[in-house]
Amino acid sequence: MRTFHRLPRILAITVPLAAIVATAACGASTTDEATAASTPVATAAAPAPVDGADGLVSQNRLGVGAAQTAAQAALAKCQADGLGFVTVSVVDRNGNVQAMLRGDNAAQHTVEAARQKAYTAAAFGANTSDLSERAKGDGATVADLPGTLFLAGGVSVKSASGSIAGIGVGGAPDGMQDQACAAAGLDAIAGALG
């Protein structure tokens, strides 16, 4: 068997094994009986399907129009409050950015802060101001999770199926000001959430 010295160890094992499995699936013989008996082959049994399940998962998501509306309403609220230096981010349940608006005078750090607050709210299904207590304490806490930010300024967007998105605002001098702007974004799309 040819080995791949420059590949990580898992690839050096996986690539030849994949070739053996693929060839065997086509009905061809890949080795003689002696070699086949001494070659370990990993197998995995698929779990039995659940009655009526077809293997697909449906997820509700905000449409691009609703995401833009929420971002615009949140930024408009901040601007009306004299906070034109914030960034607003709307993300889906998995943290993928659906809409982002950066105020004219927003610093670069506000971009990531808004995205992380939005993701935290979406992932936990709660406003980040309510979650901040969970991030306190000695030792490991939820605050150690990558991509999260447990500061006020993120609101969860929910439908009947649960949390589907998050709206985050970053850059105001106080997190509750960020939170008020994010809440204005949520209010702007509340009627579309059903």
Language-model regions, residue ranges each:
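Bacterial N-terminal signal peptides that target proteins for export
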Residues: 3-14
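Classic N-terminal secretory signal peptides
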Residues: 16-20
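Flexible, solvent-exposed loop/hinge segments and secondary-structure transition points
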Residues: 27-194
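C-terminal motif of bacterial Sec signal peptides marking the signal peptidase cleavage site
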Residues: 21-25
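N-terminal acidic, proline/glycine-rich, low-complexity intrinsically disordered segments
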Residues: 1-4, 26-27
